[in-house]
A protein has these predicted regions:
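Walker A/P-loop NTP-binding motif
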Residues: 20-32, 43-59, 75, 80-84
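Conserved segment of the helicase C-terminal RecA-like domain
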Residues: 280, 307-351
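Interdomain hinge/linker at the junction between the two RecA-like core domains of SF2 helicases
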Residues: 96-97, 173-220
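Conserved nucleic-acid-binding Ia/Ib motif block in the N-terminal RecA-like helicase ATPase lobe
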Residues: 5, 59-125, 133-136, 242-259, ...
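Post-DEXD/H (motif II) to motif III coupling segment of the RecA-like Helicase ATP-binding lobe
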Residues: 122, 130-194, 340-343
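Conserved helicase ATPase motor motifs in RecA-like P-loop NTPase domains
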Residues: 16-19, 35-40, 65-71, 139-144, ...
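Conserved interdomain hinge at the start of the Helicase C-terminal
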Residues: 156, 199-248, 388
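Conserved pre-motif I regulatory segment
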Residues: 1-35
Length: 435
């Protein structure tokens, strides 16, 4: 009953084959290694095991720890765990978050702790967390953590735990498992090459001389139009910023996502991409894996990565969960990438295309959130009652700790700002701002 309620809370009707295999294979006496492509549902797979291993009589102690390589992935995992029907206390620790807020949250130990390696060590060294009672350790996207150089940090954390059950997940084959991990009776579940789990992708090339590459990109963006949700990958943030300037000069709505941005700006860029306010996201490999970005239609490699693994992970952002997607490779005539072995069809671009129209939705921020006991339903009701807009003019809503973000139709913005500002939601006076 608990599993079915959990799935219902997540809006899922049934587990996929990989998740069913993980659930049926799980045995407390055996550690698990799950190899499965990006976007196949690994987070839910290990969350179901965590749900089985939670004990009410251990309240006040950290029972499960999930280590993630990036703060974006850690936040995504936190949201999945919060949907558990028994509502365990979940705390997420990551770089860029307010340390005082994290310390206050840790005064009462959560049942489930999610975090990035560096921030977990920070709190361990200051005795803000106690991992001595841990019964479950999950190293999510373990290959990515090693790639990012977190070997020593993970070794230090693992030495503090001694969890009786450990689980590793990876979207690529592991060459070896580091010796600091003492895994017992390891069971490996490998879906990397299973039919139906490899992304259903169509590949196209766009070949242009170096001096014409930006023009070709603009043509491709215009050809795809305003309804295609598109991720554009570059190898460096400078290239992202340069393309962003080009699009801004032409009033093409888009967002950027890379490590040079403040955490709040990165989260807002992803939020607006999720809720349909923007259909174009320029990014580095920071967005290549572990992020919950549903329904991406197209990937454009403006610059191809140097390694095949990075190429695979970028492409995993589209065709998620058995959907379909198109990958466009922007090549110079002299480019030679060893991992590009299959013949690909060239995308034909005309001389001119109309600029993409604006997305139907835009994002507003409301200055009330979870701490004010405000729910999504409260926000919808407020906008309908106070601003007088129709229910179908309100899109995705995300309620954060101190504020909330709501997608609304662009045509309704003026009315909402005029009539909705300085009203009260759940007794809290709110301001409504453009995001």
């Amino acid at each position: 009953m608990g599993e079915q309620q959990y799935l219902a809370n997540l809006g899922i009707t049934a587990l996929n084959e990989m998740q069913q295999t993980v659930s049926s294979t799980y045995n407390a006496a055996n550690d698990l290694l799950l190899l499965s492509p990006t976007g196949s549902g690994k987070t839910l797979a290990f969350s179901l095991i965590i749900q089985k291993r939670l004990h009410d009589d251990d309240n006040g102690k950290i029972q499960s720890l999930i280590i993630a390589p990036t703060r974006e992935l850690a936040l995504q995992i936190e949201q999945v765990l919060r949907k558990m029907p028994n509502h365990p206390k979940v705390t997420c620790l990551y770089g860029g978050n307010d340390l005082r807020t994290e310390k206050n949250k840790l005064k009462e130990a959560p049942q489930i702790l999610v975090g990035t390696p560096g921030r977990i060590i920070y709190h361990l060294e200051r005795h803000n967390i106690d991992l001595s009672h841990l019964n479950t350790l999950v190293l999510d996207e373990f290959d990515k953590s090693l790639e990012l150089g977190f070997h020593e940090q993970m070794e230090q954390i693992v030495a503090e735990t001694g969890a009786p059950f450990q689980m590793l997940t990876s979207a690529t084959e592991l060459e070896e498992i580091p010796p600091f991990l003492t895994l017992k009776n390891l069971e490996t579940i490998n879906y990397l090459h299973e039919k139906g789990y490899a992304p259903d992708l169509t590949f196209r090339t766009v070949t242009a001389a170096p001096q014409n590459k930006l023009k070709a990109l603009l043509k491709l963006i215009c050809k795809l139009g305003s309804e295609q949700k598109t991720l554009i990958f570059c190898n460096h943030r400078e290239a992202v910023d340069h393309i962003s300037e080009l699009l801004a000069d032409r009033d093409i709505i888009h967002d950027v996502f890379h490590g040079g941005l403040e955490q709040a700006d990165r989260e807002l860029a992803l939020l607006k991409f999720r809720n349909g306010s923007t259909h174009i996201l320029l990014t580095t490999d920071l967005a290549a894996r572990g992020l919950d970005i549903p329904e991406v239609d197209a990937i454009i490699h403006y610059q191809l990565p140097y390694k095949q693994d990075a190429f695979v992970h970028r492409n995993g952002r589209t065709a998620r969960m058995q959907a379909k997607g198109t990958v466009y490779l922007m090549l110079k005539t002299e480019d030679d990438f060893p991992y590009l072995t299959d013949a690909m069809q060239e995308e034909i671009l005309e001389d001119e295309y109309p600029l993409p129209t604006n997305s139907k939705m835009t994002t507003l921020m409301i200055t009330a959130g979870k701490r004010d006991k405000v729910s999504k339903g409260d926000i919808v009701g407020y906008l309908i009652k106070i601003a007088g807009i129709a229910k179908d003019e309100v899109g995705m809503i995300e309620v954060k700790e101190k504020n909330a973000f709501v997608a609304v139709t662009r045509s309704s913005v003026t009315t909402i700002l005029q009539k909705g500002n300085n009203g009260k939601i759940k007794g809290t006076k709110v301001r409504i701002l453009r995001s």
